[in-house]
Amino acid sequence: NTFSDENPGFPCDCTSADAKRACGIQCACWPRGDTPGGGRRIIDGQQ
């Protein structure tokens, strides 16, 4: 599976710039307590 506009909530890795770029738009890290280094894409400012 890949990061794409068709998978807006697809998990992304917040540990590197390359990984963030792979998310397509922007990667937001999960709040503390969730998977370390994990995140999700944000589209149009919406989570």
UniProtKB/Swiss-Prot annotation:
- Post-translational modifications: Contains 2 disulfide bonds.
Give the keywords, sorted: Cell adhesion impairing toxin, Disulfide bond, Hemostasis impairing toxin, Platelet aggregation inhibiting toxin, Secreted, Toxin
Looking at the UniProt entry, the stretches that span the membrane are none
Q: Name one GO cellular component term.
A: extracellular region
Report the main location listed first in the record. Answer: secreted
Q: Where in the cell is it found?
A: Secreted
Q: What molecular function does GO assign, one term?
A: toxin activity
Top-rank taxon of the source lineage equals Eukaryota
Coiled coil ranges (UniProt) are none
Per the Swiss-Prot or TrEMBL record, what residue ranges does the short sequence motif Cell attachment site cover?
A: 32-34
Which tissues show it?
A: Expressed in salivary glands.
Role description: Potently inhibits platelet aggregation induced by ADP (IC(50)=157 nM, complete inhibition at 514 nM). Also inhibits platelet aggregation induced by collagen and by the thrombin receptor peptide SFLLRNP. Is a potent antagonist of the fibrinogen receptor glycoprotein IIb-IIIa (ITGA2B/ITGB3) and the vitronectin receptor alpha-v/beta-3 (ITGAV/ITGB3).
Q: What is this protein called?
A: Variabilin
Q: Which organism is it from?
A: Dermacentor variabilis
